Design a protein with these regions (language model features):
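Short, mixed-charge low-complexity intrinsically disordered segments
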Residues: 39-69
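A short, exposed loop/beta-hairpin motif centered on an aromatic-Gly-Thr core
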Residues: 17-24
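Short aromatic-glycine-(Arg/Gly/Cys) micro-motifs in beta-strand/loop hairpins
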Residues: 1-17
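A short, charged, amphipathic alpha-helix used as a generic interaction element across diverse proteins
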Residues: 24-39
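Compositionally biased, intrinsically disordered low-complexity segments
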Residues: 20, 33, 49-51
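Generic structural motif
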Residues: 12-14, 26, 51
Length: 69
């Protein structure tokens, strides 16, 4: 996995089907996630190849791949 890996950002909504917010490079999706208000971040996750990554894992990936704000 690298910064150019294709990923999608999804919004989790109670009582509704999760909706895809955006798709593109992992680096761009992490930056979009980080631009969200801190209180909203728990509602979002990133999908890569059928695997979902929550807020904590997204931050770990950002550190591992040296993705800055």
């Amino acid at each position: 996995m690298d910064k150019d890996t294709q990923a999608t950002l999804h919004h989790r909504r109670l009582g509704r089907v999760d909706g895809m917010t955006a798709g593109g490079r992992l680096e761009d999706m992490v930056r979009l996630f980080r631009s969200l208000a801190q209180s909203k971040r728990p509602e979002y996750f990133i999908m890569i190849g059928g695997t979902s990554y929550g807020p904590e894992k997204i931050e770990n990936l950002a550190s591992e791949l040296s993705i800055e704000d």
